[in-house]
A protein has these predicted regions:
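Gram-negative (and chloroplast) outer-membrane scaffold detector with strong preference
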Residues: 87-165, 173-181, 186-188, 225-231
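C-terminal segment of classical bacterial N-terminal signal peptides
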Residues: 16-24
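Extracellular loop and loop/strand-boundary signature of outer-membrane beta-barrel proteins
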Residues: 45-46, 68-72, 109-119, 161-170, ...
Length: 236
């Protein structure tokens, strides 16, 4: 009599095991879907469309320039101003760049009997030349340039009619100039760029001494500007 009872118990257990998955599936199907508490996060890359295929760009920065206002002057001048530059790209790597820069400030003066101390001085550059796009990716780039042109030096504004040689200054003049350096660019979007521009600034001024004799002087100084560049949407 024990065998039938055991078989009956075994059959009951098997029936429960078979029915359990079916009940679980039914409960799972009947449960309504739950919506997420927060919306789905979508990442957007602001630099995804940086391709370096623009035709034009324009940059403006706050500028610094070190210079000497005279050939034998011991004290240098630290000038501040603006750097406005633009480029026309002929290909991916080569372009033509033009730059206009204005630097103003004061300078030390040579010993004199006219009580002239710290007079105003200024340099205004207008140069153009070749530009080369070096290593670059969507985050930034390195660009080199070599530009040539002229500079107007304003040295006599505060001399009150005193000859510039009295304070070891150059006279007011337009002189040959060159700017060689480049740009360090950090892309902020497809069109906007944070730009740092360090340069070597070369000038070739003429000075006149008390006897009227003239001589030319070749100077190399450091300049840097920090600002923003805008790349126009027009493509090559």
């Amino acid at each position: 009599m024990r065998l039938p009872v055991s078989l009956s118990a075994l059959a009951a257990v098997a029936a429960l095991v078979l029915c359990a998955p079916a009940r679980s599936q039914a409960q799972a199907k009947s449960a309504p879907p739950q919506s997420p508490v927060n919306g789905q996060y979508v990442a957007i890359d602001p630099l995804a469309n940086v391709h370096y295929d623009n035709r034009y760009d324009l940059s403006l920065g706050l500028a610094y320039d070190h210079m000497k206002a005279g050939p034998t002057l011991l004290q240098g001048s630290n000038l501040g101003g603006l750097d406005l530059s633009g480029s026309y790209w002929l290909s991916r790597h080569w372009g033509i760049e033009g730059s206009g820069r204005a630097y103003v400030g004061t300078s030390g003066a040579g010993p004199n009997t006219e009580s002239i101390n710290g007079p105003f001085v200024a340099q205004y550059f207008f140069v153009g030349g070749a530009e080369w796009l070096g290593p670059h990716n969507k985050h930034g780039d390195l660009t080199a340039h070599a530009m040539f042109g002229g500079v107007y030096g304003d040295f006599q504004k505060d001399l009150r009619g005193t000859p510039p040689y009295v304070v070891d200054f150059y006279k007011n003049q337009v002189a040959p100039a060159a700017i060689i350096g480049g740009h360090f660019d950090l892309n902020r979007s497809e069109q906007w760029v944070f730009r740092v521009t360090p340069d070597a600034v070369m000038t070739h001024y003429t000075s006149t001494n008390a006897s009227g004799m003239s001589s030319t002087h070749y100077d190399v100084n450091f300049a840097i500007s920090v600002g923003a560049e805008y790349r126009f949407k027009k493509k090559r």
